[in-house]
Amino acid sequence: VHVHYRQQAAGKGHLPSWEPTVAVEIAQAIREACPGIIFNQSTGIVGPDISGPVACIRAVKPEIAAANAGSLNYLKVRSDGRWAWPPMLFDNPVEKVAAFLQVMQETGALPEFECFDVGIVRSVDMFLRSGLYRGHPDLNFVMGVESGMPADPALLPILIGLLPAGATWQVTAIGRENVWPLHRRTAELGGNLRTGLEDTFYLPDGRKARSNGELIDAIVGLARAAGRECATPAEARKMLHLAA
């Protein structure tokens, strides 16, 4: 389960929290409710100060933590030509990536390399070849951000061809009607599947999802239609080279 920590005060739940005590409270609740679950922590933060996410990694010790593997101008334009939000740089220079990787190595977290564009996929291979990272490569193709890779299934063979040897991979599909053909093709090509309200509000039939659970039920259906079955937590740990 991929987790973003949020402030717990009334009316503040839309705001992120990097307080370790909050992170531990959330993590404990999830682990108690779902024994054996693989905990995947978000780490995305703008700017050079990564002390908040780092403190949460050290406190929670997630099995997986997001490793944003390159920078991106994070942009979106509305239909009337106005910016959806002020243009921003999601800055992830090599020095920042290296600092996160060091902490993940120290705490035993598997880095999930978040790749927003083709060049970032290629960068992960360079991290391995340069020795910046020496563990199992697990890549997440983030597709559908307007200033990144489009949520186009035709891109998948190209991206798969750029994977480091032995890598596992998955797709985060962002958008509306375009995300489900992408999930379907990911399942057919052997990739891992993920979804949630962070990435889409809509089910394959166009209805608005009422919960993450409805989205998960839909994506499980796609996996089975492609002749695949969902892994148990133990099977997923083995596949991702995580401790049992």
Placement of each model-derived feature along the sequence:
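Short beta-strand segments at enzyme active-site cores
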Residues: 1-10, 39-43, 113-114, 236
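Alpha-helix-loop-beta-strand connector modules within alpha/beta enzyme cores
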Residues: 12-41, 97-100, 104, 158-166, ...
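Short secondary-structure transition/capping segments
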Residues: 12-17, 51-52, 77-78, 125-127, ...
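Alpha-helix N-cap and loop-to-helix initiation/capping positions
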Residues: 14-22, 85-95, 150-154, 207-214
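Active-site beta->alpha loop and helix N-cap motifs at the rims of alpha/beta catalytic domains
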Residues: 16-91
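Catalytic alpha/beta core domains of metabolic enzymes, predominantly
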Residues: 64-198
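Structured C-terminal cap/extension of enzyme domains
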Residues: 122, 157-162, 184-244
